């Protein structure tokens, strides 16, 4: 069984629960309102029921035998990068991650998001479906995007409806709007329809 450790990273406008290994590699990240820690932990625990090969421990209560000094440095470095990313200090911050959830199609969609949607860009479910050779599968693509378990790092927030409106987001459309406003800057108003 592999041990993972979770901690919260507070941004100026929202909170992220990050689960990572002793090398600082992220396996899970969920976003939530600033006062939603308990519900975020509950959701994470529910999600990890589907991955019994992992044991997720609170970083604050982790035994010193599980996290040594070298690991502490790596974990702290990744959490600081996450803080920089969600506070919009470094929109291009590269954070190591490993996908442990998802079907082959979901992983294909997530790879597309990571590789084809850089900071400052957006796409629609329909355009992604067309690009992946599935032109009549916008809804399936939407389900794949919504199944992402590594918020912000895998940029599911950069996918909007064909109408230009912000559509569903596992962590709430207000958080999606906040992230997009900060990533797009002055382009937000001309790109997103309310």
Swiss-Prot record:
It is found in: Nucleus. InterPro entries: MethylDNA_cys_MeTrfase_AS, MethylDNA_cys_MeTrfase_DNA-bd, MethylDNA_cys_MeTrfase_DNAb, WH-like_DNA-bd_sf. GO terms for cellular component: nucleus. One of its GO terms (molecular function) is DNA binding. Involved in the cellular defense against the biological effects of O6-methylguanine (O6-MeG) and O4-methylthymine (O4-MeT) in DNA. Repairs the methylated nucleobase in DNA by stoichiometrically transferring the methyl group to a cysteine residue in the enzyme. This is a suicide reaction: the enzyme is irreversibly inactivated. This enzyme catalyzes only one turnover and therefore is not strictly catalytic. According to one definition, an enzyme is a biocatalyst that acts repeatedly and over many reaction cycles. This is Methylated-DNA--protein-cysteine methyltransferase. The lineage of its organism: Eukaryota, Fungi, Dikarya, Ascomycota, Saccharomycotina. The gene is MGT1.
């Amino acid at each position: 069984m592999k041990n993972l450790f979770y901690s919260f990273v507070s941004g100026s406008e929202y909170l992220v629960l990050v689960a990572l290994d002793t090398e600082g590699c992220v396996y899970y990240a969920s976003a939530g309102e600033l006062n939603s820690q308990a519900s975020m932990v509950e959701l994470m625990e529910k999600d990890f029921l589907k991955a019994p090969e992992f044991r997720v421990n609170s970083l604050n209560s982790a035994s010193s035998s599980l996290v040594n000094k070298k690991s502490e440095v790596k974990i702290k470095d990744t959490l600081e990068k996450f803080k920089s990313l969600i506070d919009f200090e470094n929109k291009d911050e590269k954070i190591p991650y490993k996908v442990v959830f998802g079907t082959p199609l979901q992983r294909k969609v997530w790879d597309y998001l990571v590789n084809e949607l850089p900071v400052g860009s957006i796409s629609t479910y329909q355009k992604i479906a067309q690009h992946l050779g599935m032109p009549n599968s916008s809804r399936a693509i939407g389900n794949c995007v919504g199944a992402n378990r590594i918020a912000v790092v895998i940029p599911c927030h950069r996918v909007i409806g064909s109408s230009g409106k912000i559509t569903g987001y596992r962590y709430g459309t207000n958080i999606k709007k906040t992230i997009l406003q900060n990533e797009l800057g002055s382009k937000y108003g001309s790109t997103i329809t309310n």
